UniProtKB/Swiss-Prot annotation:
Residues 1-65, 90-113 are annotated as: Disordered. This is Transcription elongation factor SPT6-like. One of its GO terms (cellular component) is cytosol. Transcription elongation factor that enhances the transcription elongation by RNA polymerase II (RNAPII). It holds the Pfam family SH2_2. Residues 1017-1088 form the S1 motif domain. Keywords: Nucleus, Transcription, Transcription regulation. GO terms for biological process: embryo development ending in seed dormancy; nucleosome organization; transcription elongation by RNA polymerase II; transcription elongation-coupled chromatin remodeling.
Length: 1322
């Protein structure tokens, strides 16, 4: 290893300090592995040969072109003659490709004559052969075409006519579009089948993924038992669940093909215990018509569906394995009683397996005892690495292994208490060594080898026994603990603000205590080699396992033979438990922790989405009337100037009405011209408001400019109110609402494909503003818009750790949430038919999906409006789909239906399902008959329904329980509850009321930060804008203003009279957040050295996080003698900078990729930094960075980075520019060198030895190669041998290229070409 001292010498490149010539060289590069040094006479002769070669090549190409058939000609021949074949097509194509290579060779540069390993005669012969072959093929093809079809030109004319005619014929979609396009648009044949089949679309996808589901009573009962047991394990969620309700759910789902939203809405009576009834009408209290229902996420039903999928897949796998095992066993050549017994035990274990892991255990046991048969001789066989077990079995050791006593199966039965053996184990009358002598062979030459092999076989069999694994698994998962500690890299990287800081020092945390995403963080940190993770089973539990196994496996005999055999058995148990079972349990524990963490993270992710999508639209003055139209929204998105701040006006249907660009409305300049532009924009804005009369203004909160913009808007409105007469101003202007809105979703919409389809040719900021306004009007529809084939919704940042989830996992949760909420809200079909964007939630309606919804949408748009729910069957959906969807599709007089006088049934404007219309009509008639004397008229039903709709108070007179008893419908309380609510107010919005953002949300939206990034104690950088004697006004990188008081500047702040003597405008200060004034959008800062060094834990500290462990490690480090030179810590915040020594930097880069770099402090003082780059394994280059324009007021100023950075003659403004302009191009050239064909790894002497060998093979050639210079890291060595002795020259590595002999080369091949021509001009 190339030793790096604490402060290595900054090596100057050996080729530095030489002037660069301006002489230009030809653009040449080499293709040979060696070259000859030729005289000048040879050049003229070879030049003449090259011109001759080019002339012949052009002649050949000219001939070839005249005999080449176009691809269309071959297609024409094939179309008109079924027997026609393009003979030797592949050879013809190959010939063409090789000819191209020859032509390229003809065009090579001057270096082509250095190639000495090509057989010229062979090459010419090959070219002649190709010419003859190509000519014969082409002429035959043309002659055949002429004889059969005539002149090719006439054929081409006919072909063009045919093409024009075929364009008129309708082609298949598969021929017109790429498969990806057809898949995205759901236009494949499979999509057509899904659309046509009268089964809910999501159910079809579900069943396609899991296969055929057994629907007999026994299978459903067996599955319900399994699901119930799983639910009981989920933190007691199954305690209140009735198992019969699970059976009914499975029957409704699989047999009746009813989706979850339908079951939750219309089959409550059949699965009460599966529904959260805490706030429902059937919670045991009296029915209250005035109580507003709330949307509910039916998690238990979705959980049962997920368990249903797992059960079907588990059963499918068990069935497949049963058939496979049976077939394999029947093929066994030796069907002994032992094998039959083993097979029967495997089948019994397979039938009893209840989880995938238990099935894995059974599969391991079967494959151990019934390995794959050897393939017959002569057949191809993939080489397999034979296991030690199979080798022992092959040499007959298995027979001896069976003599240790109880088998693995017997031990497992005893541990599981399934069968207790009363007979004592009989010990052999020989020692193990004596008995092992009978099994010696060539592979196992002595008794100890035989014993070792036999013990291994017994241990493996024990480790593969399902009952034993289940026993150990139960103990391990309940008692195992996890500890974490940082690696050397992690100790440097993970500070108190790092995302892994909370899991840096965990000590013996039990598996069952892991919660949230903690394990995912540990797993990620381990992948990044920042943490070491250890699993451990406590000593007492380990002893328990060994003790219980020994109790059933060891002999109770006291003889010498019994003791000797027991010693062997103890070794077997130790090997089985420690060598096989526990390591596999650790893998299972990791998998289990990952699964649990992802499940919880998915739930949290879904909950955030649920909170957003279940939020109601903005209502004027919180008016909850369902009849009131959506508000007219004026949406505003701030623009920096290009684009300008933009206002868009949306009508109550969310359609774009008008756009106003106003780039000067928020100006705060006192310039006269700026003020004029501002006044003009204010007048235009006020006219915009007067013309369109919006109900609310939604302002996207993205930065502090939006706060000023809000003030300017209010100022303009107040000025208008003051100037205009009272009778001229609309009442709403006095209390004009302006709300902040989150711009994250509108930005996704702006860049999505659907926005271009819905708002073609509109500017991006207009699309964004439209989305902002629509989100206020209908959050559900706006979010659904991004749930199309592109799945743009997955880019919405809902959870800080959502990156740990796969896209498919996230979208499955998105679909679950969207399906549940959409069906509780419903869709106004007629309104959506007139406004396309409102159709976006249709795909989530029960029974539908993206394919069926798209088909239904097209049909409804063509129809314009629909007046009866039953008409939906005429729009391409079958009866089963109609049953699922009908109750959630709202039919009312909206959209184009407003202008129609056609009758619309009021029940179609409710959540009442058509199957319950009879009950609803009967209830309405009873109420109507009670309130009036007219009840026998023909139109009594319509009048009764209108009566209860107009006078919902009449329904309150009914005592529901008594009414149900009178109708003998006590088991339909939930159905009647829904009927009464919907008759009172159809499709009442159950979503939560719209809430404006609170002060915390407003602050984080405006700042663009989060609680994690701008919390108290966070290290930040601030730029000084203004300094007074007592304080400095700064600006953080996020744009927030900061205040640094004099007393917070340094520890001796009280002695500072005037802060302006310490700071200047433009200074960059590294400081810590002291506190946040969220109401004023200000941050108080501190940069005292004592405060900067304080360690602060953020958030809740884990109970198993032990700082003492961390401190003990630090104390141990302090005990180590400080042999290295110290450096001054620097107050620099940059991803590539670390306060570490050169040795620590070497350790940090040791396992990184070549080209990785780090910036660290320099021992040369506070005006220098060191850039360390990994050149090769164990070779690191150090580049000196000189800092300029630094203030020398105090130590804090010196610890900050300079305003200019200089490396060599290049000057940079900051470390980012150093990385972009210096490191990145330098690493690019480094990789070019390392990947060059002439590059060799090794030291200079090792490369010289390689060249000597190459020279011996080709004594007439000048052999050369490139290598890394270990003496001058950052440089390379050009080594070459002309006659006998190696010669060396250095090559410098720079961002601009490679420096060789005072010349800079941007291309390594050009450098090699220059070296060849000027090998004598050193």
């Amino acid at each position: 290893m190339n030793r790096i001292d604490e402060e290595p010498q900054i090596h100057e490149d050996p080729v530095e300090n030489r002037e660069e010539d301006d002489e230009d060289e030809d653009d040449q590069y080499e293709f040979d592995d060696g070259f000859l040094v030729n005289g000048s006479d040879d050049g003229e002769e070879e030049e003449e040969q090259r011109h001759c070669s080019e002339k012949k090549s052009r002649s050949r190409r000219k001939k070839d072109e005249s005999f080449t058939l176009h691809e269309d000609d071959y297609l024409l021949l094939k179309d008109n003659n079924d027997t026609f074949q393009r003979n030797k097509y592949k050879r013809l194509k190959k010939s063409s490709e090789e000819e191209d290579k020859i032509n390229n060779d003809d065009d090579d540069d001057d270096l082509s004559h250095f190639i000495v390993d090509e057989d010229d005669h062979g090459a010419q012969g090959m070219r002649r052969k190709k010419m003859k072959y190509k000519q014969g093929t082409d002429s035959n093809a043309l002659r055949y075409a002429n004889d059969v079809f005539g002149d090719p030109e006439e054929l081409l004319k006919l072909r063009k006519k045919d093409l024009k005619y075929n364009e008129k014929i309708e082609r298949k979609l598969e021929d017109e579009f790429e498969p990806m396009v057809l898949s995205e648009k759901y236009m494949t044949e499979k999509d057509d089948e899904i659309r046509k089949l009268d089964v809910p679309e999501r159910m079809q996808i579900f069943e396609e993924a899991i296969g055929i589901v057994s629907l007999d009573d026994m299978s459903i009962q067996e599955e319900s038992n399994w699901i119930y047991a799983r639910l009981l394990q989920e933190q007691g969620q199954g305690c209140l669940i009735n198992k019969d309700d699970i059976v009914k759910f499975l029957e409704m789902f699989h047999v009746q093909k009813l989706e979850i939203p339908f079951i939750a809405m219309y089959r409550k009576e059949q699965c009460r215990s599966l529904l959260d009834s805490s706030d429902d009408d059937h919670d045991g209290s009296d029915f209250n018509l005035d109580k507003k229902l709330e949307t509910k996420w039916h998690k238990v039903l979705w959980m049962i569906q997920d368990l249903d999928r797992k059960w079907v897949l588990l059963r499918k796998r068990k069935t497949a394995l049963f058939g496979y095992y049976t077939k394999r066993f029947e093929e066994e050549t030796c069907m002994s009683d032992l094998n039959k017994s083993l097979f029967e035990s495997v089948i019994k274990s397979l039938q009893a397996a209840e989880t995938e892991r238990e099935v894995d255990d059974v599969d391991s046991k079967f494959n151990l005892h019934f390995p794959h048969c050897e393939i017959d001789e002569g057949q191809y066989k993939r080489p397999n690495r034979k296991s030690q077990y199979s080798i022992c079995s092959k040499f007959g050791i298995k027979e001896f292994a069976n003599k240790f006593g109880y088998s693995a199966e017997q031990l497992g039965l005893a541990l599981s208490l399934e069968k207790v053996f009363v007979d004592e184990l009989e010990d052999a009358k020989k020692t193990p060594e004596e008995m092992a002598l009978n099994y010696e062979c060539a592979m196992f030459g002595d008794s100890q080898a035989v014993l070792k092999g036999a013990r291994h076989m017994a241990a493996v069999e024990i480790s593969c026994e399902p009952s034993i694994r289940k026993y150990v698994r139960g103990i391990f998962m309940e008692n195992a603990v996890v500890s974490t500690s940082p690696t050397p890299d992690g100790n440097v990287v993970i500070d108190s603000f790092h995302r892994f800081s909370a899991v840096k020092w965990l000590s013996e945390k039990p598996l069952r205590k892991f919660d949230g995403v903690q394990w995912l963080l540990i797993q990620k940190a381990e992948e990044e080699k920042l943490l070491q993770v250890t699993f451990k089973l406590p000593e007492n539990q380990m002893n328990r396992i060994i003790s219980e196994c020994s109790e059933h496996y060891l002999s109770v005999g006291v003889s010498k033979y019994a003791q000797l055999w027991n010693e062997q058995r103890k070794l077997i148990l130790e090997d089985a438990v420690h060598g096989f079972v526990l390591p596999s349990m650790e893998k299972e524990a990791r998998s289990l922790l990952t699964s649990r963490a992802k499940t919880q993270l998915l739930s949290e992710y879904g909950q955030v989405l649920w909170n957003k999508v279940s939020s109601g639209p903005y209502r004027r003055n919180n008016n909850t009337s369902e009849e009131e139209a959506a508000p007219r929204v004026l949406a505003c998105c701030w623009g920096p100037g290009n684009p300008e701040t933009t206002f868009v006006m949306l009508d109550s249907s969310g359609e774009l009405v008008d756009v106003l660009y106003s780039g000067s409305i928020g100006l705060r300049s006192r310039d006269v011209n700026d003020q004029k532009r501002k006044k003009m924009d204010q007048d235009r804005f006020l006219k915009f408001i007067r013309d369109h009369q919006p109900d609310v203004l939604a302002l996207a909160a993205v930065n502090l400019s939006c706060v000023r913009l809000k003030d300017e808007i209010y100022e303009a409105i107040f000025q208008m109110v003051e100037e205009l007469p009272l009778n001229y101003v609309d009442d709403r202007i006095y209390d004009f609402p302006l709300v902040y809105a989150d711009e994250s979703l509108p930005r996704l919409y702006e860049n999505s494909r659907i926005s271009s389809e819905q708002l073609p040719q509109q500017a991006g900021i207009v699309k964004r503003a439209v989305s902002l306004g629509r989100y206020l009007q209908n959050p559900l529809a706006m979010i659904s818009t991004l749930c199309g084939p592109g799945r743009d919704i997955l880019s919405w940042k809902l959870h800080s750790f959502q990156d740990f989830l796969d896209p498919d996992e996230k979208y499955e949760m998105v679909e679950q949430v969207m399906v549940d909420i959409t069906n509780q809200v419903g869709i106004d079909i007629n309104l959506a038919a007139s406004h396309e964007w409102l159709f976006s939630p249709l795909q989530f309606v029960s029974g539908l999906g993206p394919r069926k919804a798209a088909s239904l949408q097209k049909s409804l748009v063509r129809a314009g409006s629909i007046f009866v729910r039953k008409e939906l069957i005429n729009h391409g959906i079958g009866k089963k789909v109609f049953v699922n969807a009908a109750g959630f599709l709202r039919i009312r007089r909206s959209g184009l239906a407003c202008s129609s006088s056609q009758f619309i049934d009021l029940l179609d404007d409710t959540r009442i399902h058509p199957e319950s219309y009879g009950l609803a009509q009967e209830l309405a008639k009873d109420v109507y008959a009670h309130d009036t004397v007219r009840g026998d008229e023909d139109d009594a039903i319509e009048m009764a329904i209108e009566h209860v709709r107009d006078e919902p108070a009449s329904l309150r007179k009914i005592v529901l329980d008594e009414y149900l008893r009178s109708k003998n419908q006590e088991n339909k309380k939930e159905t009647y509850s829904l009927i009464m609510r919907e008759l009172s107010c159809g499709f009442q919005d159950w979503r939560s009321l719209f809430k404006e953002v609170d002060s915390d949300e407003e602050f984080y939206m405006i700042s663009g930060e989060t609680k994690e990034t701008i919390g108290e104690g966070r290290i930040v950088q601030a730029t000084v804008k203004k300094v007074t004697s007592g304080k400095a006004k700064c600006v953080l990188d996020c744009g927030l203003p900061g205040i640094l008081l004099k007393e917070d500047y340094s520890d001796d702040g009280r002695d500072i009279v005037d802060l302006s003597n310490k700071l200047c405008e433009g200074d960059i200060v590294t400081c810590k957040v002291k506190s946040i004034l969220k109401q004023r959008y200000h941050v108080l800062l501190v940069c005292k050295e004592s405060e900067m060094r304080k360690h602060r834990n953020l958030g809740d500290v884990d109970d198993y996080y032990h700082e003492e462990k961390r401190n003990s490690v630090l104390i141990e480090k302090e005990k180590v003698p400080k042999e290295k030179k110290q450096f001054k810590s620097r107050m620099i915040v940059h991803p590539r900078f670390q306060n570490i020594t050169a040795e620590q930097a070497t350790v940090y880069l040791s396992d990184k990729n070549i080209g990785e770099s780090i910036v660290r402090p320099s021992s040369r003082g506070l005006n220098h930094l060191t850039l360390m780059i990994k050149i090769s394994d164990n070779v690191y280059a150090n580049k000196e960075i000189i800092e300029g324009e630094k203030e020398n007021k105090d130590i804090v100023s010196l610890q900050r980075i300079g305003k200019t950075l200089k490396i060599g003659n290049e000057t940079f403004e900051d470390l980012d520019e150093v990385m972009d302009r210096y490191v990145d191009p330098l690493v690019t050239h480094l990789m070019t060198m390392l990947n060059h064909r002439k590059f060799r790894t090794g030291t200079k002497s090792e490369i010289d030895d390689l060249l000597r060998v190459e020279k011996g093979v080709n004594p007439k050639m000048v052999v050369y190669s490139f290598g890394v210079s270990h003496e001058h890291p950052g440089s390379f060595i050009l080594s070459y041998i002309r006659s006998a002795n190696p010669h060396h020259e250095y090559i410098g590595l720079y961002p601009k290229g490679f420096k060789f002999r005072k010349r800079m080369f941007g291309d390594l091949d050009k450098l090699a070409a220059y070296f060849k021509r000027h090998i004598d001009n050193q």
